[in-house]
From Swiss-Prot:
Bilayer-spanning residue ranges: none
Disulfide bonds: none
Entry similarity comment: Belongs to the UPF0178 family.
InterPro entries: UPF0178
Extent of the signal sequence: none
Protein name stated in the entry: UPF0178 protein RD1_0321
Pfam families: DUF188 (PF02639)
Organism superkingdom: Bacteria
Species of provenance: Roseobacter denitrificans (strain ATCC 33942 / OCh 114) (Erythrobacter sp. (strain OCh 114))
Amino acid sequence: MTALYIDADACPVKSEAERVATRHRVKMYIVSNGGLRPSQNPLVETVIVPDGPDVADMWIADRCGTGDVVVTGDIPLAAKCIEAGALVLKHNGEALTSANIGNVLASRDLMADLRAADPFRQGGGKSFGKADRSRFLDGLERTLRKAATLG
């Protein structure tokens, strides 16, 4: 049976994911190391993991599998989940797959190296807007339908 795993650290689409999961009657796990208000929705389980590097990521990676959906902005976690057979979405609705995760990992590493080489470089990512939420909702809807055929 399909499950939806949310890497909740800095996730801007938790409430949107909950709405879609509820509509599909899919169990949803919101995984974090704390600071979240638990949902009253019986389909949503808030999982609080101990503090530590990548503990939430490991919890998700250890449990997800074929037919599950993972929402994360963490590219190494996405790679592990894809390897386990899960379908993965970024917060903006972009699907990460076995076909594109290698390039995404390489780009991530390159950008980390560039930032390390120039610590005075200012700037950040673009803000998360209404269009991003809309793309996420559409992407999650399609991905959950696809997952239902796999799991």
